[in-house]
Regions:
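Short, basic (Lys/Arg/His-rich) helix/loop patches that form interaction surfaces
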Residues: 133, 137, 195-210, 220, ...
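N-terminal DNA-binding module of tyrosine recombinases/phage integrases
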Residues: 8-10, 17-122, 284-303, 310, ...
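C-terminal secondary-structure termini that scaffold catalytic or DNA-interacting sites
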Residues: 195, 199-201, 239, 252-275, ...
Length: 401
């Protein structure tokens, strides 16, 4: 029978749950607090019902660990027994970093079964409002949605393992990600940008490696993280191709090398002849610089590097591209739009579509998982082609009439 003991303003209910392998009695406990709006008699009946229900759940095996295990405790178990067995080591490390930075400090102390939608809403609202790295503003909805996905996986696993009965994540929605219009170059603007790269490299104001970075991003449609992660072993000069099989990500200020975002992101892409020629010249410059640096060299074969040969920081191309465009715009009346390295990938797809490249080839080259993804992203280019198709059909029909 359940034991009831008053402890301050609450009551502790204790039920025996058999004996362990050492013949030691297993005791399960629960806490009940009276309702101040009810009479003593009503609270007494409620306490007795709670004690009976608790004893029934313990005796029937329906008492779940989630009523005494904290979120932090289960998150550690989830990491070891679930995440590490199913996910890449870099992915689990990123998950651990996000949990430790954002989730554990806010809800880690809560009993797993006591985590409610309001706790998660408060967590996400706090992330959107203020960053922890001292930078102004809050985290993006994309980051918050990523954290929500991790919490949701943890809670869903707890349900599957019969530790809790329901996941609070089912009853909330993470912040909506606002679709940002990506700026990209027209064919004419792309030609101007490439010419500006070559001019700057000849004059010594744009490093050859920056020129090649942007040339590859535009001609091959690479993601920024894919380009930063490139190594010389990924370049096949004989076949004229580049192999994409890894990507660089920054999470909470730390660099992580990981496999691309989906299976189709791993691909082999043909490189234009003029870019291949630039890569050949850059290799000679690269090797000479490495020899010059001697013992100070800290590189491991990455194409795009810092002064000591170590891998280029992912934000470097963004800063460099802003400077190049600003310098050009300062000297010309016809301005270039403020396109980012990601915008070069967008430009690449748009140019391919405008040149009637098959719609199935475009996502394969850019590493999209589905053709529909490319169609959704590059709607503007497809709409222009559709308008051209309508005009062509109209001209054909008018001629027949």
């Amino acid at each position: 029978m359940a034991s009831i003991r008053k402890r301050g303003k609450s009551y502790q209910i204790t039920v025996s749950n058999g004996r362990d392998i050492h013949d030691k009695q297993i005791l399960e406990t629960a806490t009940w607090t009276p309702d101040p709006n009810k009479t003593d008699k009503q609270n007494q009946k409620a306490l007795e019902r709670f004690a009976m229900d608790f004893e029934d759940r313990v005796k029937s095996g329906k008492y779940l660990d989630g009523e005494k295990m904290t979120f932090q405790g289960f998150a550690g178990r989830w990491m070891e027994e679930y995440a590490k067995m199913r996910l890449e080591s870099t992915t689990t490390e990123i998950y651990r970093l996000l949990l430790d930075a954002h989730v554990i400090p806010v809800i880690g102390h809560l009993r797993l079964s006591r985590v409610q939608p309001q706790h998660l809403n408060r967590l996400y609202a706090g992330m959107l409002k203020q960053r922890k790295d001292g930078r102004p503003g809050g985290y993006s909805p994309t980051t918050v949605k990523r954290v929500h996905a991790i919490v949701s996986s943890i809670m869903s696993t707890a349900v599957q393992w019969d530790i809790i009965t329901d996941s609070p994540c089912r009853r909330i929605k993470p912040p909506r990600q606002e679709k940002r219009e990506v700026s990209f170059f027209t064919p004419e603007q792309a030609s101007i940008f490439l010419a500006e790269l070559d001019r700057g490299t000849m004059e010594g104001t744009i490093p050859l490696q920056h020129n090649i970075f942007f040339q590859l991003a535009l001609s091959c449609g690479l993601r920024r993280g894919e380009a930063v992660a490139l190594q010389w072993k990924d370049i096949d000069f004989a076949d004229g191709t580049v192999t994409i099989n890894k990507s660089m990500a920054i999470v909470e200020g730390k660099k992580y090398l990981k496999t691309p975002k989906n299976r189709t992101s791993e691909r082999i892409i043909s490189v234009p002849a003029h870019v291949l020629g630039m890569l050949g010249r850059y290799r000679l410059e690269y090797d000479a610089y490495r020899a010059q640096l001697g013992s100070q060299w800290a590189g491991s074969g990455h194409l795009f590097i810092q002064w000591d040969g170590s891998q280029m920081y992912p934000s470097t191309p963004d800063h460099a591209m802003r400077k190049i465009i600003a310098r050009y715009n300062g000297a010309h009346e016809e301005k270039l739009p403020h396109v980012t390295p990601h915008g070069l990938r967008h430009t690449s797809a748009t140019l391919l579509i405008s040149q009637n490249v098959d719609i199935r080839t475009v996502p394969n080259r850019l590493g999209h998982a589905q053709t529909s993804t490319a169609m959704n992203i590059y709607t503007h280019a497809l709409q222009k082609k559709d308008a051209q198709a309508a005009e062509t059909l109209e001209n054909l029909l008018m001629q027949k009439n």
